[in-house]
Amino acid sequence: MSRMNDETMEDKPDDSNGPLSILMDSVNNNTQVLINVRNNKKLLGRVRAFDRHCNMVLENVKEIWTEVPKTAKGKKKAKPINKDRFISKMFLRGDSVILVLKNPLGAPPQAN
């Protein structure tokens, strides 16, 4: 290996072992990730692309959140309602990302 290649290899971060490895694994293997975002919603989808700021392009996303209906004074507390919606493609800005997990249910990879 030439000297220039050695220097280039040293400067390049290793995404296979670092904190972005879950995102890299999702891109390479087409696996789902669960992303907790700042608006108290969860995104379950497949990562198509990402950068070091955790900006992401996601596909086949299920957005999940809980709403508590408002009640009149003196009435019982309303039960929380789980809601979700499907988003085929989206761009997620990295500053809203709190946590990224491999899909806890382990859904199989989806063919393109």
Swiss-Prot record:
Plays a role in pre-mRNA splicing as a core component of the spliceosomal U1, U2, U4 and U5 small nuclear ribonucleoproteins (snRNPs), the building blocks of the spliceosome. Residues 1-15 have a biased composition (Basic and acidic residues). It comes from Dictyostelium discoideum. Residues 1-23 are annotated as: Disordered. This is Probable small nuclear ribonucleoprotein Sm D2. It is found in: Nucleus; Cytoplasm, Cytosol. InterPro entries: LSM_dom_sf, Sm, Sm_D2, Sm_dom_euk/arc. Residues 20-106 form the Sm domain. Keywords: Cytoplasm, mRNA processing, mRNA splicing, Nucleus, Ribonucleoprotein, Spliceosome.
